[in-house]
Swiss-Prot record:
It comes from Cupriavidus necator (strain ATCC 17699 / DSM 428 / KCTC 22496 / NCIMB 10442 / H16 / Stanier 337) (Ralstonia eutropha). InterPro entries: P-loop_NTPase, Rhodanese-like_dom, Rhodanese-like_dom_sf, SelU. One of its GO terms (biological process) is tRNA wobble uridine modification. Monomer. The keyword Transferase applies. Gene3D superfamilies: Rhodanese-like domain (3.40.250.10). The keyword Transferase applies. It catalyses: 5-methylaminomethyl-2-thiouridine(34) in tRNA + selenophosphate + (2E)-geranyl diphosphate + H2O + H(+) = 5-methylaminomethyl-2-selenouridine(34) in tRNA + (2E)-thiogeraniol + phosphate + diphosphate; 5-methylaminomethyl-2-thiouridine(34) in tRNA + (2E)-geranyl diphosphate = 5-methylaminomethyl-S-(2E)-geranyl-thiouridine(34) in tRNA + diphosphate; 5-methylaminomethyl-S-(2E)-geranyl-thiouridine(34) in tRNA + selenophosphate + H(+) = 5-methylaminomethyl-2-(Se-phospho)selenouridine(34) in tRNA + (2E)-thiogeraniol; 5-methylaminomethyl-2-(Se-phospho)selenouridine(34) in tRNA + H2O = 5-methylaminomethyl-2-selenouridine(34) in tRNA + phosphate. Coiled coil: none annotated. This is tRNA 2-selenouridine synthase. The gene is selU. Belongs to the SelU family. Its EC number is 2.9.1.3. The active site is at residue 95.
Amino acid sequence: MRPDTADFRTLFLSGVAMLDVRAPLEFARGAFPGAVNLPLMDDAERHEVGLCYAQKGQQAAIELGHQLVSGLRKAARIAAWAEFARAHPDGYLYCFRGGLRSQLVQQWLHAAGVDYPRVTGGYKAMRGFLIETTDAAAAEQQWFVLGGLTGSGKTDVLADVPAAIDLEGHARHRGSAFGRRALAQPPQIDFENALAIDVLRHIDAGWRALLVEDEGRFIGSRDVPQVLTQRMQASPLVWLEASFDERVERVLRDYVQGLAAEFIAEKGSTEGFEAYATRLREAMAGISPRLGGARYGKLSALLDQALAQQAERGEVDLHRGWIEVLLREYYDPMYAFQREQREARIVFRGDRAAVTDWLRAHTAQRG
């Protein structure tokens, strides 16, 4: 049998399969990318055992757990774990602290003829390791921050620079009032875990510096780790420039055509389009206090006309109308002010090709 492991770095770098035997509620609160939840106890069973532990102590709780998970229920769970182990012979199992639950699953699997190692310290220890990884990277790594006006193509540049970490991708949100995607954002802890693993892999690859997009503290409702936010605010800024027309077309591609495609893929043509249209209207309403009544009314009318044309004929031309007004009168003045505040941090500026070349050169792998 392979030994149990506490080598968290290798676990996350290798991306081996992990079997999470915590209760579903625990898993939903925070998990690791790709981990599979096959619990020893479901939420109701865990609740009963927890009450018993509080009232009668550990031994009584253990006995109750064996009573609740017995017979056909126990056999079905062992079968599911064994199937996972056979499908992922290089994987590991874990519970919250690497204690009784994972040990019991290991014992039951062994009795069924399957030896499978567990992670020493469990979820809690791995989570702590990832928090330390983010903290250390924020303190010790060199970082560049990519800024630019709305629609300048920052996400496109990130995709072209191997040393880049896509915060918005991990948060599943484009980082503005119109940034919500068709799928919900991941839980906060899932976001932090996935981000830390990505950071770990980039550091292991030996990049001289790491690149992130200029973000505030929040991306949608996800909170960027404070240590990283503070480091970003003090890091050199690279400014991406693009013409107004290019930016309009990029916003049209991402926030209209791309968003519509996401919703339709998720919900089907009719329901998906309705959900997409609702999402755009909600986003516009969300910034109405800052737009003012008259401008909000104008933009809402333009948006409604564009959505009607898109629904009827599949055309998106009219969307350029509200996009142009929103960029020129709302986003550009806001970003211009922010750029003035950060001017001293800008170390390079240019179009997509120039910025991409500069960033590749300044983040290249060591050696």
